[in-house]
Amino acid sequence: MTNDTYLKTTINKSRIGRLATVDLECKPHVIPVVFVFDNDRNCYFIPIDEKTKRSRPENLKRVKNIQENPNVALLLDEYNEDWTKLYFIMIRGKGSILGGKKLEQNEMRLLEKAHKLLCDKYPQYQKIGIGKYLIKIMPQKVVVWNNDG
């Protein structure tokens, strides 16, 4: 398996990641997220879904942080008692918020594609709804580590 194939396979099988953002005071904020990778656009989408939240989507800490500082990291990892099967993938990149009331046509198509990818990977979204906002990550650096012995 080539490195590129290994990377795509591992990313696509990962069910959860951890999104790291930073506020203006350089205080980190890390949360668990679901995500999809869009092969056509070489970017990641993270929904701001309709599960219960403490505040409106536009007021969430992750959203405000990305609006103030677009530098983000998405960490995907696997823990196994057999340490030869451990891995992590860290994607560093620029985050942006898609969605809201005033959408351009190309943004609408992008949201529709992301929603389809997310519903395909996570069928739970057919019941709870994905929401009107997404985080888009354009990767700048990908760090891969595994211990496959």
Where are the predicted features?
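Short Pro/Gly-enriched beta-strand edge/turn motifs at strand-loop
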Residues: 1, 13-19, 117-119
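A short, Trp-centered hydrophobic/proline-enriched beta-strand micro-motif
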Residues: 11-23, 72-76
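General beta-strand recognition
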Residues: 18, 43-45, 73, 136, ...
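A short, well-structured catalytic beta-strand-centered motif of the EAL phosphodiesterase domain
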Residues: 33-37
